[in-house]
Every structure is written in C-alpha cells, then in structure tokens.
Curated annotation (Swiss-Prot):
Protein family (similarity comment): Belongs to the SurE nucleotidase family.
Role of this protein: Nucleotidase that shows phosphatase activity on nucleoside 5'-monophosphates.
GO MF, one annotated term: metal ion binding
Lineage: Bacteria, Pseudomonadati, Pseudomonadota, Alphaproteobacteria, Hyphomicrobiales
GO cellular component: cytoplasm
Keywords: Cytoplasm, Hydrolase, Metal-binding, Nucleotide-binding
Enzyme Commission code: 3.1.3.5
Places the protein is found: Cytoplasm
Pfam families noted in UniProt: SurE (PF01975)
Protein name: 5'-nucleotidase SurE
Organism expressing this protein natively: Methylorubrum extorquens (strain PA1) (Methylobacterium extorquens)
Length: 254
C-alpha cells in the first residue's frame, strides 16, 4: 500500500514525524509531501497567484511552498503521477480539529483534496488541554493511530467521504475506547479580537479564543475527546442539506 502523508503545521512539525511513524507501521512505501512553513487555518485554499516551489529534503520526503491542498495535488499529479497513492493521511495536527474547526483546518483540507482526487483519505489530530501546545501527548496518537486506521480501512471509505480522527488529551493507556461521533458545535462567541499597538503606535490585531465553558452535545466529537475517547467522524464532500433542499424547492415552486 502506497501512502501519501501531508499536514498543515509544516515539514518540520513533530506531528508529521508522529504520522510518518504511524504510516510506516502500516506500509513500507510512505511518501511525505508537506508545506515548507506552517499553514494552520488555511482551510482548503490553493496557491493560484504564486508559483509552487518543490524541494526534496530526503528520500521520499518533499517540502512545498504552498498549502496542504497544493501538497496533495503535487504529490498525486506530479511526484507520484506514475503510481498514485492508495491512501492519504493528513496530520497529526497540533490540536484537535472538531466542531467548526473542520471548516478552517488545513489538516482536514489535505484529506479533503485526497478525497476529491479519488483516494481514500483520513485526517488525524491530537487534542491538547490546559497544558497547552507545549505539552501535547503525541504518544496517544502514535500508539492508537495504526489500529484506528486499520479499522477504518477494514470498514471501507466510500467515494466522496473522508474520515476525521481526533485523539484525546491523555496518555495512551488512559484512552476510553473509540467513539464514532457527529461533528459538534461550539459557542462561536469565544472568538475574539485582541487589539494591540506596535512600537510606532500603529494598531494591529490577533484572533484570540476565550476558554470554552459549555457542555458538549452527546454523540459529538467534542464530547468524545472530553471523555478521553478517540473520535472518528465520517465527513461528506457534498455539503448539500437534503431536507433544506426539498423545503427551498417547494418554496420556490409556490
């Protein structure tokens, strides 16, 4: 099985190293094509106004000056054009990709691009808690990742579907199983603007997020990782809401 690995945290990110280890537990044909720099939050964007710079940094390892979607396209359409991958793995992201994170995430986008190109694709993320990004428990993803991926492949991934996997903020031995979960919803009032001034007195701004204080819904990815369970969420490329499609169609016919 040929596996193509990418991420959005960049070619030197510890989560990418973790995912390479996971991939090598599944196959001896692992290729890495990842962004040259951190691309967190770029979602499914493409580099349309800048050239893509490709640099080989090791055996089967490439860095692209571009987004995660660019990396998958370069991997499939250029680097591996004569023998395309059987599986795309994107991650392991530094922090969970649950609820609305899915719409912003470059990690999810890497798997999404693979799905668009007709390749089975899985996004993986490692949650962190009060200890912050400096204290991520990468061993959780590293230990449980191969088994979870094998199970997903055994179940099968239908065309047009990608799978979003989130590992909880705990040690491997403290994981309380796997939960197949729906995408949750946060209180987006948590999103704030942090206004500052530079040394010349000019204003600049950072996006900031207040600490979440809400009860996650049952059966959601948010609830799963809060309970130290691995969340597995199938996502559809087709974003059409079928009930609303019917309702709108009826209204426009009236």
């Amino acid at each position: 099985m040929r596996i193509l690995v990418t991420n959005d945290d960049g070619i030197h990110a510890p989560g990418l190293e973790t995912l390479e280890g996971i991939a090598r537990a599944l196959s001896d044909d692992v290729w890495v094509v990842a962004p040259e720099t951190d691309q967190s939050g770029v979602s499914h964007s493409l580099s349309l106004n800048d050239p893509l710079r490709l640099r080989q940094i090791g055996e089967k390892r490439f860095a692209v000056k571009g987004t995660p979607s660019d990396c998958i396209i370069m991997g499939v359409a250029h680097i591996l054009k004569d023998h395309k991958p059987d599986l795309v793995l994107s991650g392991v992201n530094r922090g969970q990709n649950v609820a609305e994170d899915v719409t912003y995430s470059g990690t999810i986008a890497g798997a999404m691009e693979g799905t668009i190109l007709g390749i089975r694709s899985i996004a993986l993320s490692q949650a962190y808690g009060a200890g912050g990004r400096a204290n991520l428990k990468w061993a959780c993803a590293a230990t449980h990742g191969p088994r979870v991926i094998e199970k997903i492949l055994e179940i099968g991934i239908e065309p047009g579907i990608l799978v979003n996997v989130n590992f909880p903020d705990c040690e491997p031995e403290d994981v309380q199983g796997v939960a197949v979960s729906a995408q949750g919803q946060r209180n987006q009032a948590l999103l704030q603007i942090d206004a500052r001034h530079d040394g010349r007195g000019n204003p600049y701004f950072w996006l900031a997020f207040a600490k979440a204080r809400f009860e996650p819904g049952n059966g959601t990815d948010l609830k799963a990782i809060a309970e130290n369970r691995i969340s597995v969420t199938p996502l559809r490329l087709d974003l059409t809401d079928e009930p609303e499609l019917t309702r709108f169609a009826a209204a426009f016919r009236a």
